[in-house]
């Protein structure tokens, strides 16, 4: 099975007026359940083998062949977080993490530290999700308006194909103040990722909580190919 979402992601990736103001994180991940018996890292059964930081759709498409080749070689999956990260905020967070490492008397490879602190800064920047400082989380209209303006999305992970239509209908019928809540539907190996703006998920998904996972500030699938040698069913 091959899942290639490059074209679809390129169509929804937000473009900043100044591309250097924002960046997006791509990770190539090997997973234990894909046949990587050595993928475990502590309690984490996944391992990142390569990361990319891109600023534009053009950069994404320029990296497409390279990313696909590396995924096929390592038997990895490529994931992308389509929530833009503010470049200045990322650099400030990285400086904070570097300072913490030095205070703790880091004595390892400094290249590893720089790479690790950048990945950590990218992962942690934007963790405020849709709360936006002093905005009352109950003010759904304001939250949705700000989310649409700032390109802040959720990933609704649905691994049960039999309920996809029901989930889509519930999201579309949810209480909202913007015209469209669903930004895109991204295929995965076992189901679908609904890329959405924030909505009243508690009411919308009543009775489906155990079948869905809502991921804020998270990744969606960019590329997957288990037709190369080495994958397990």
Describe each region flagged by the PLM:
Residues 1-188, 199, 205-207, 220-233:
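Signature for HUH/AEP ssDNA processing cores
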Residues 210-211:
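Polybasic, proline/glycine-rich intrinsically disordered low-complexity segments
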Residues 215-216:
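Short, cationic low-complexity segments
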Residues 191-197:
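Catalytic nucleophile-His microenvironment captured as a short glycine-rich beta-strand/loop
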């Amino acid at each position: 099975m091959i899942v290639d979402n490059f074209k679809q992601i390129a169509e929804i990736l937000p473009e900043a007026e100044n591309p250097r103001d924002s960046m997006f994180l791509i990770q190539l991940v090997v997973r234990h359940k894909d046949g990587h018996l050595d993928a475990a890292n502590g309690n984490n059964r996944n391992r990142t083998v390569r990361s990319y930081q891109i600023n534009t759709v053009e950069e994404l498409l320029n990296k497409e062949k390279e990313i696909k080749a590396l995924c096929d070689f390592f038997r990895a999956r490529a994931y992308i977080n389509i929530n833009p990260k503010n470049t200045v905020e990322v650099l400030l967070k990285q400086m904070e993490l570097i300072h913490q490492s030095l205070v703790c008397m880091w004595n390892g490879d400094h290249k590893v530290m720089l790479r690790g602190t950048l990945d950590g800064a990218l992962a942690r920047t934007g963790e405020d999700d849709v709360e936006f400082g002093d905005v009352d989380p109950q003010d759904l209209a304001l939250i949705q308006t700000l989310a649409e303006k700032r390109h802040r999305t959720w990933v609704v992970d649905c691994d049960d194909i039999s309920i996809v239509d029901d989930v889509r209908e519930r999201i579309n019928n949810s209480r909202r103040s913007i015209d469209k809540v669903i930004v895109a539907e991204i295929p995965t190996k076992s189901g679908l990722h609904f890329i959405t703006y924030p909505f009243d998920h508690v009411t919308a998904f009543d009775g489906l909580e155990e079948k869905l996972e809502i991921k804020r500030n998270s990744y969606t699938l960019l590329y997957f190919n288990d037709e190369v040698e080495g994958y397990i069913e």
